[in-house]
């Protein structure tokens, strides 16, 4: 039986390579049929904001990678309600369908996965 993997992405999509690396790990795990979940926490919630154009920062747009997650079997996608609220992001305007979790649900989520990677 495969061990489940939760990837916590805490960095904004334009602050460096961590956001892309987190997505790459999730996609690779999904490609190998591992049970993978992804949690967008803190500034990682900005990855879910629609209409980003990071080309002027010489960064690649991560939206295509985000949209590919379900195609690779990564269906368990979560975001912190607190992270959304603190960053002024509205759940109904996110670029990807995710489950919004309160603090207690986040603690419960961490207990459900065998391995956790934070980037």
Swiss-Prot record:
This is Protein TusC homolog. It is found in: Cytoplasm. Its main location: cytoplasm. GO terms for cellular component: cytoplasm. Keywords: Cytoplasm. InterPro entries: DsrEFH-like (IPR027396), Sulphur_relay_DsrE/F-like (IPR003787), Sulphur_relay_TusC/DsrF (IPR017462). Could be part of a sulfur-relay system. Belongs to the DsrF/TusC family.
